[in-house]
């Protein structure tokens, strides 16, 4: 019988911001002069204490990363996970995840994750994500063919984790590595469980083929159901058996209040934060990058893959050096 596991997650936001009418967006473009180091020091330690408390209460732990944003002060999730690997005792440690298309050294990712797995004595759950479109320019990478780069990077990491008879070379379309022979190797054999985020039914096939966990964020039932159904169908197609229940993961937003009235008030404020965090207000941030979305689903929504947001993506000052 499969037991449902519950993961505690906080995105480590920086809450002390100026009035909202004084800024366009709290992602990518908000000047870091607004981030007071002493305050950030306090917040980091507070968030680490909360994660450790979650471990003591029997919850598993999830961390993520984003870049140049007040919504998430963790630009390097492996560092936070390394701290938690030493400070916690029982919790499974999920990173969701490593933005592989934005990482030019997949072998480095394999090394970092293996190190965390060994320090934690095999408690790592390793997630891979494509990243979000508005962080592509900040990462100095082209968003084109992000899914292809993710899966090629994934293949190199898996090979690095599972090859134990000496160095190998890797020649891919996007990545080329020599003398790959990571130390240490993962604690878990053959490797830590892998999670992949998915935002549509069409992206579930490779996740199901590999038997990885498919995870969904910020989506209601009407969107989640067809994605989960597609994963189950693809898993059955590839493996000849039904997908275990623990192959599907969902991130929900939860607010707890002392009573119904307080809970409703807090939940409404939470929804306001999610909907008004100033991404949608800036065209160049909400833009769909070239190659980020397949033309087929865009056409099904009545959108042109060659117009609108694609032009916005390349407009200045998004790629400006000034």
Task: Tell what function each PLM region has.
Residues 1-91, 192:
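N-terminal beta1-alpha1-beta2 module of alpha/beta enzyme domains
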Residues 2, 8-35, 147-183, 223-322:
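An alpha-helical appendage that flanks or caps ligand/catalytic pockets
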Residues 6-10, 61-64, 93-97, 124-128, ...:
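Hydrophobic faces of well-ordered beta-strands that scaffold small-molecule active sites
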Residues 41-44, 101-115, 321:
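Glycine-rich anion/phosphate-binding loops
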Residues 47-51, 78-82, 110-114, 151-158, ...:
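Generic structural signal for well-ordered alpha-helices
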Residues 54, 65, 84, 116, ...:
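Conserved, mostly hydrophobic/aromatic
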Residues 87-90, 120, 206-215, 269:
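Glycine-enriched alpha-helix->loop->beta-strand junction motifs that scaffold or abut catalytic
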Residues 197-223, 227-228:
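A conserved active-site cap/scaffold subdomain adjacent to cofactor or substrate pockets
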């Amino acid at each position: 019988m499969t037991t449902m596991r519950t993961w505690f997650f906080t995105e480590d936001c920086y809450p002390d911001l100026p009035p909202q009418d004084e800024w366009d967006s709290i992602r990518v473009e908000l000047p870091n002069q607004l981030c007071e180091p002493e305050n950030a020091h306090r917040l980091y330690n507070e968030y680490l204490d909360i994660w450790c408390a979650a471990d003591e209460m029997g919850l598993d732990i999830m961390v993520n990363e984003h870049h140049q944003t007040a919504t998430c002060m963790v630009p390097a999730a492996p560092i936070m996970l390394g701290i938690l690997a030493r400070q916690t005792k029982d919790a499974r440690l999920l990173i969701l995840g490593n933005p592989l298309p934005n990482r030019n050294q997949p072998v480095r990712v394999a090394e970092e994750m293996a190190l965390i797995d060994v320090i934690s004595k095999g408690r790592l759950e390793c997630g891979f994500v494509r990243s979000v479109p508005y962080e592509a320019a900040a990462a100095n990478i082209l968003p084109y063919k992000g899914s292809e780069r993710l899966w090629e990077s994934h293949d190199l990491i898996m090979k690095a984790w599972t090859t134990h008879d000496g160095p190998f070379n890797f020649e891919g379309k996007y990545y080329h590595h020599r003398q790959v022979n990571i130390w240490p190797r993962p604690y878990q054999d053959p490797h830590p469980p892998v999670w992949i985020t998915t935002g549509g039914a069409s992206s579930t096939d490779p996740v199901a083929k590999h038997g990885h966990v498919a995870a969904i964020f910020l989506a209601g039932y009407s969107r989640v159901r067809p994605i989960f159904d597609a994963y189950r169908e693809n898993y059955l197609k590839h493996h000849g058996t039904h997908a275990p229940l623990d192959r599907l993961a969902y991130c929900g937003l939860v607010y707890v209040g002392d009573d119904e009235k307080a809970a409703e008030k807090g939940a409404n404020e939470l929804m306001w934060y999610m909907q008004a965090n100033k991404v949608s207000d800036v065209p160049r941030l909400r833009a769909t990058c070239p190659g980020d979305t397949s033309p087929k689903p865009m056409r099904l929504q009545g959108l042109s893959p060659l117009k609108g947001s694609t032009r916005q993506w390349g407009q200045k000052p998004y790629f400006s050096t000034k």
